[in-house]
Amino acid sequence: MHKLAHISFGIVGMFVNTCMVAKYVIINWEMYSMKKVNNDTVFGILQLETLLGDINSIFSEIESEYKMSREEILILLTLWQKGSMTLKEMDRFVEVKPYKRTRTYNNLVELEWIYKERPVDDERTVIIHFNEKLQQEKVELLNFISDAIASRATAMQNSLNAIIAV
């Protein structure tokens, strides 16, 4: 019996040790998993800044080449998509700081991208139109923007995938 008890205690001891090892492995795996999840989450959230940097660099490249601000580019893109509209209507699509508003639209007029019209019946309203004479320049600008996006497409897609995985 003594030998059997010794074997039983040995088996119980091994079982306890195995359970302790298993518990240790599980705890460490959970900590590793949490750390990995936390690291992946942090990385994904940080990719917001990376993606924003890529987007800002596209606008900077456009600004450098075409001497137009981000707001001016967005105004043109909105006009091309939605058509002519009042300045008040445009405010719903493109946010322009009040202190920059007049200068922004006047710059587009000076560059001849747009022209303004005041209806006869309401002198307070200003309607802006794309200057159709610049159709070729429009195509060139759109191609330039498309190329700028394409050159960063993989990096932006990777950032977006990491963000979505959060």
From Swiss-Prot:
Residues 87-110 bind DNA. InterPro entries: HTH_MarR-typ, MarR/SlyA-like, Rot, SarA/Rot_dom, Transc_reg_Sar_Rot_HTH, WH-like_DNA-bd_sf, WH_DNA-bd_sf. Pfam families: Staph_reg_Sar_Rot. GO terms for molecular function: DNA binding; DNA-binding transcription factor activity. GO terms for biological process: response to stress. The gene is rot. This is HTH-type transcriptional regulator rot. SMART domains: HTH_MARR. Keywords: Activator, DNA-binding, Repressor, Transcription, Transcription regulation, Virulence. It comes from Staphylococcus aureus (strain MRSA252). Belongs to the rot family. Global regulator with both positive and negative effects that mediates modulation of several genes involved in virulence. Also, modulates the expression of genes not previously implicated in pathogenesis. Coiled coil: none annotated.
